[in-house]
């Protein structure tokens, strides 16, 4: 009987912890969008980070540059698509600004300070299967990496990144934006997971 009671209490405790954690992170999912782009016969997936309440979204340049038919949807309404327009593409960084006509919540604080070993979180649209939460640490501070024949100043993390995660927010435990997931490279059998 004691075993059953202990298991029941443990189950209730785990459900409570899960619900608290889930509701705590839900607000960050509301500030992140899924991106899909039809290119010829291929469908490209990516992620976007909302940075203003009037529909401005930041993502990676390599995702949207020279692309048409950029569609946006939210995790809680996957059947509703918004067409995005490219506002600006950075010539120096792997960043692009796009816009949709929708009022929404957004990441309103950016934190430029971080440290080696710091716990961080990310949200990504892995392979177009919808948004998911990743957790990890900063494993290397500023590092120049060659990606697509360009030298990119990046931060290395051990968060898993899949196709479709580019442009997703990386944030700290306070919910302040630190950067975007940008690329994954294989180097000497190990992955370098970059954040711009």
Predicted regions and their residues:
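Positively charged n-region of N-terminal signal peptides that target proteins for export
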Residues: 1-4
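Composition-driven detection of intrinsically disordered, low-complexity segments
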Residues: 7-8, 191
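Bacterial N-terminal signal peptides
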Residues: 8-16
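Active-site region of chymotrypsin-like
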Residues: 26-41, 100-106, 132-196
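Conserved active-site neighborhood of the chymotrypsin/trypsin-like protease fold
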Residues: 39-45, 52-124, 128-132
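Beta-propeller and closely related beta-sheet repeat lectin domains
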Residues: 46-49, 167-169
